[in-house]
């Protein structure tokens, strides 16, 4: 009985660790607040939503990848996201977006 309780406790610990890892990579945002912060037009907002949804999927894929694959996947997702955002946003909007994304990545410990 003691052995099975230890196994359950270990499994719960692993599940919590996996959940925390996935939460760190969850890049879901409130698009209304993002639109306000960046001063987006309706057309820009639609494009930003599409690009950001793809970014969210790529970050979740990275979260679920092996530790060795994770960093290259995150780097590629960020590079692709920034390339598309640079096309959609004007210079001031892009600068603000970079600041927001960089702050988010730093706060989650993803910029190492």
Model region roles, listed by residue range:
Residues 10-112:
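Charge-rich (acidic/polar
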